[in-house]
Amino acid sequence: MPGQQRRGGGSGGSDRRERRDRSGGGPAQEKTAYVERVVAINRVAKVVKGGRRFSFTALVVVGDADGTVGVGYGKAKEVPAAIAKGVEEAKKHFFKVPRIGSTIPHPVQGEEAAGVVLLKPASPGTGVIAGGPVRAVLECAGVHDVLSKSLGSSNPINIVHATVAALRGLMRPEEIAARRGLPLEDVAPPAMLRARAAGVGA
C-alpha cells in the first residue's frame, strides 16, 4: 500500500508538469514569431512635491528577419513593462524593406535629428558590418550582408531612427527602372539577375 501511494504521487507530479508544459507552450511560441532587440534602456526621474518618481524608457526593434521591421519606444515604471510597450509600439510601425538576397538593392543614406547612417550593399558572406544600434535594425529586418557607417551623432536613439530612415529610402530595381524608363537589366545589380536566373526571388 505505501508503494502504491508513492506511485500515485509520482503520477500526479508528472501530470502537473505536463499541465505546466502545455500552459507555457503558447506564449513561448508567440515570442519566437518575431526577433526582438532592446537597443537602449534609460531611467527617467520626475520631480514632484513628495520627491522624485522614477520610470524607465526602452527603445525596442522588432522584426520577422524576413524583410519586415519596426521600431518602438515604451515608457513604464518597470523595465519589463517598458520593453513590452516598446514591442507593441514597434509592431504598429512595421514596414517592408526591399532586399536582394541577403543584402540591400543600392547604397542609401538616412538622417534623423543629428544621426546620419550610410548603408552599402555587400557580397554574400560579408556579414553585418555595423555597430550595435544599426546591427539590431538590420538583423531584425533580415539583412545579413551589408556595410554601414555612422556619420553623425553617437546617440543610439538617433542612430536607430536614421537607420530606419535609410531603409525606408530603399527602392526596388523595378521601381527605379519604371521611374527612369529603362529596362530592368540596365538598373538591376548582377546579383539580382543571377538570383532570378537561379529561381531565387529578389
UniProtKB/Swiss-Prot annotation:
Keywords: Ribonucleoprotein, Ribosomal protein, RNA-binding, rRNA-binding. GO terms for cellular component: small ribosomal subunit. Residues 34-97 form the S5 DRBM domain. GO terms for molecular function: rRNA binding; structural constituent of ribosome. Residues 1-13 have a biased composition (Gly residues). Pfam families: Ribosomal_S5, Ribosomal_S5_C. It comes from the Bacteria. Residues 14-23 have a biased composition (Basic and acidic residues). Disulfide bonds: none annotated. GO terms for biological process: translation. Residues 1-31 are annotated as: Disordered. Belongs to the universal ribosomal protein uS5 family. PANTHER family: MITOCHONDRIAL RIBOSOMAL PROTEIN S5. The N-terminal domain interacts with the head of the 30S subunit; the C-terminal domain interacts with the body and contacts protein S4. The interaction surface between S4 and S5 is involved in control of translational fidelity. With S4 and S12 plays an important role in translational accuracy. Located at the back of the 30S subunit body where it stabilizes the conformation of the head with respect to the body. HAMAP family: Ribosomal_uS5_B. Part of the 30S ribosomal subunit. Contacts proteins S4 and S8. This is Small ribosomal subunit protein uS5. It comes from Parafrankia sp. (strain EAN1pec).
